[in-house]
From Swiss-Prot:
Residues 515-534 bind DNA. The gene is sigA. Belongs to the sigma-70 factor family. RpoD/SigA subfamily. Keywords: Cytoplasm, DNA-binding, Sigma factor, Transcription, Transcription regulation. One of its GO terms (molecular function) is DNA binding. Residues 400-476 are annotated as: Sigma-70 factor domain-3. GO terms for biological process: DNA-templated transcription initiation. It comes from Chlamydia pneumoniae. This is RNA polymerase sigma factor SigA. It is found in: Cytoplasm. A motif (Interaction with polymerase core subunit RpoC) lies at residues 345-348.
Amino acid sequence: MFMNTQNSQATEVSSEEESQKKLEELVALAKEQGFITYEEINEILPMSFDTPEQIDQVLIFLTGMDIQVLNQIDVERQKEKKKEAKELEGLARRTEGTPDDPVRMYLKEMGTVPLLTREEEVEISKRIEKAQVQIERIILRFRYSAKEAISIAHYLISGKERFDKIISEKEVEDKTHFLKLLPKLITLLKEEDTYLENLLLSLKQPDLSKQEAAKLNDSLEKCRIRTQAYLRCFHCRHNVTEDFGEVVFKAYDSFLHLEQQINDLKVRAERNKFAAAKLAAAKRKLYKREVAAGRTLEEFKKDVRMLQRWMDKSQEAKKEMVESNLRLVISIAKKYTNRGLSFLDLIQEGNMGLMKAVEKFEYRRGYKFSTYATWWIRQAVTRAIADQARTIRIPVHMIETINKVLRGAKKLMMETGKEPTPEELAEELGLTPDRVREIYKIAQHPISLQAEVGEGSESSFGDFLEDTAVESPAEATGYSMLKDKMKEVLKTLTDRERFVLIHRFGLLDGKPKTLEEVGSAFNVTRERIRQIEAKALRKMRHPIRSKQLRAFLDLLEEEKTGTSKVKSLKSK
């Protein structure tokens, strides 16, 4: 009996020691990682920890030591966040500039924004959707919306407005059938609007009883409901409905100004008859505007305050969605660097694509927002590169053709190990060699003559181009020396011989003359001039004279070659 008790005590001691060791191991792992997961706690703790109370004590102990206990999903999310933060940090380090460089600051700031889970994306999308429903409901209460809708409907029927820009194609499948129904819808809306105006005018009658007023108000509310139902049948896009809201806000400013005017006139009307007359006119003006809006002043103010509140909620939710996905824009934009746009411009264009994605995202389809937004961001970036990167704009379809040719060239180069010829590339892509050459020529980027050669250089490309219109200093010096030497050699001839050679070869004015022209100057025959010329040339060929001029033959040959090159370039 004594032995059994002793054994059980020893077992308890060893169990406590094991528990202590496991707990120390748990703490060491948590400190090393900065956290501990529930899965790791279950693996490390001994089997003796099998009650909820014991597990709770361990969790309380870890919490007391400021150790976070996380789910495995949270750990994966933290790892993903750290990985992206490191990528952004590396990208920021690679970005040139000073510590206050805008790219560096932007990337650093983006690293602090947390990513959204699928559930959070859905929650934000629901908030946006709810806000949009409320915004539409409030805007459609005003008579302005009916007038704007009728005006747009006429533009659609006449073809002056694009159907897909105004009407939600998600709601309207058959465009032709919808356009046929539009005239009837316009008629119904006009009838309801006229009826609504008559009800509003009737409510302002001074001798109206309470029962009649209640009946008119009931009819007015029903008319408003029918009008809103007809307006929803137009299936306008949300951005079009928000444009109706701009008309409401503009009218609201006018209402407030008129209200202020009436309040000022009320104070002055007690002492001034003219002010009293102005007050009556202002009240009539206010009444007309209330009828035009379909709302009283108090209803108008209440609706606008509510409209502004829902618009703010919508913008806040959209901003949250955009800011949480800015890192996605950066990761896509960095793949399109060195394409003619700066990194900041690429980010800016990508952000515009991201905002469009937020507007058009449909969470009910089940896919993640990042998957959907990627296509909008890519489209915005590639379209910006096509439109802005080149001095001479190339159409988008041509950009796609160029990319196709470049991909084909890269593929052939990897297969053969050499740059493919236009013929090989044409065979691979199913094009003609001439078409491939034409595409290569279009793909070349024009370079500005004022562009700098290297960073911080004061030289430009234009400085390195030869000006063919200006004579080179070397040639000018050579010709000057040739002219002087020619004068010296010609002085060794007789006056008549020198005169004949100068005029026959145009050495004076660059215009050679015929034998007859030179002969008329001497009043001799052309045959006699030919004889004098032949004799003079024989003298010029004498080694004593020709030796002095032979050194200039190279200069003449260079001039001849250069002229032929210029002519060939011009012909091309």
